[in-house]
Amino acid sequence: MAMRQCAIYGKGGIGKSTTTQNLVAALAEMNKKVMI
């Protein structure tokens, strides 16, 4: 399977870090390999 890239960006204080951590946690629970 090909690698997919997902970019989460925007101005400060909009929850980028929180969104990233929640997304990574959900993917890891589904036994997906993740790199941040």
From Swiss-Prot:
Mind listing the GO molecular function terms for this protein?
4 iron, 4 sulfur cluster binding; ATP binding; metal ion binding; nitrogenase activity
Q: Which residues form a coiled coil?
A: none
Which Pfam families does the annotation name?
Answer: Fer4_NifH
**Cofactor(s) this protein requires:** [4Fe-4S] cluster
Q: What class of enzyme is it?
A: oxidoreductase
Highest taxon of source:
Bacteria
Q: Where does ATP bind?
A: 10-17
> What's its catalytic activity?
N2 + 8 reduced [2Fe-2S]-[ferredoxin] + 16 ATP + 16 H2O = H2 + 8 oxidized [2Fe-2S]-[ferredoxin] + 2 NH4(+) + 16 ADP + 16 phosphate + 6 H(+)
Task: Tell whether ATP-binding is among the UniProt keywords.
Answer: yes
Q: Which InterPro entries match?
A: NifH/frxC, P-loop_NTPase
UniProt remark on cofactor binding: Binds 1 [4Fe-4S] cluster per dimer.
Which UniProt keyword terms apply here?
4Fe-4S, ATP-binding, Iron, Iron-sulfur, Metal-binding, Nitrogen fixation, Nucleotide-binding, Oxidoreductase, Plasmid
The UniProt record lists the keyword Ribonucleoprotein: no
GO biological process: what's one of them? nitrogen fixation
Instruction: Identify the EC number(s).
Output: 1.18.6.1
Q: Which family does it belong to?
A: Belongs to the NifH/BchL/ChlL family.
Known partners and oligomeric status:
Homodimer.
Give the protein's function: The key enzymatic reactions in nitrogen fixation are catalyzed by the nitrogenase complex, which has 2 components: the iron protein and the molybdenum-iron protein.
Q: What is this protein called?
A: Nitrogenase iron protein
From which source organism is this entry? Enterobacter agglomerans (Erwinia herbicola)
Identify the coding gene: nifH
